[in-house]
């Protein structure tokens, strides 16, 4: 599996200028600081929606792609219609049939979706795609990638009806995950995320 980042649409100068417009300040037309990006991403103020990412997962299993299609942002998959492809009969196609998935979510969409898909209760195969995307996005937008965290880290505790206890076990390993400071909690999670990938 490999996430291919095709394009980042919008830019941080626009986000900064949109924020300034809401308080009747003139645009600056410049890239904001890393500190500003981190703060606005954690605050989840509406100007962050001006930036989106177009990405592709090639040959993803159909059933995994359908987990992603349940989220409400632009996405496309290969047609399975028999008059559009000849790889298999649509009526006979297995759930594991490979398709290409193209996504086009904005920042807010990814924050909301990845909270669910990085969760340890999500299908492990689907979670691996979430992790791969987070890692690929980091090369283009590190501050954005860093706010993609599981719901338990986002909330500071597990909200699931059937708690998997992952968060509690991770807090035992790294108490900073229980911090009431959101940036501290996210930094602790991201440190663990990157250590697990090496």
Task: Describe these PLM feature segments.
Residues 1-198:
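Family-specific signature for flavin-dependent thymidylate synthase
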């Amino acid at each position: 599996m490999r996430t291919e980042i095709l394009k980042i649409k919008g830019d941080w100068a626009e986000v900064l200028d949109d924020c300034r417009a809401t308080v009747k300040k003139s645009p600056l037309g410049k890239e904001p600081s890393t500190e500003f990006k981190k703060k606005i991403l954690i605050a989840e103020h509406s100007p962050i929606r001006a930036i989106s990412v177009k990405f592709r997962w090639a040959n993803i299993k159909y059933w995994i792609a359908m987990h992603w299609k349940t989220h409400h942002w632009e996405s496309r998959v290969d047609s399975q219609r028999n008059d559009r492809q000849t790889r298999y009969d649509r009526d006979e196609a297995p759930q594991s049939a490979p398709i290409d998935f193209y996504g086009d979510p904005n920042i807010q969409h990814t924050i909301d979706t990845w909270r669910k898909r990085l969760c340890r209760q999500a299908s492990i195969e689907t979670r691996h795609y979430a992790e791969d995307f987070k890692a690929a996005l980091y090369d283009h937008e590190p501050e954005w990638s860093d706010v993609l965290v599981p719901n338990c880290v986002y909330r500071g505790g597990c909200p699931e009806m059937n708690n998997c206890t992952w968060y509690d076990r991770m807090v035992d390993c790294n108490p900073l995950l229980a911090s009431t400071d959101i940036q501290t909690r996210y930094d602790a999670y991201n440190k663990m995320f990157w250590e697990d990938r090496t």
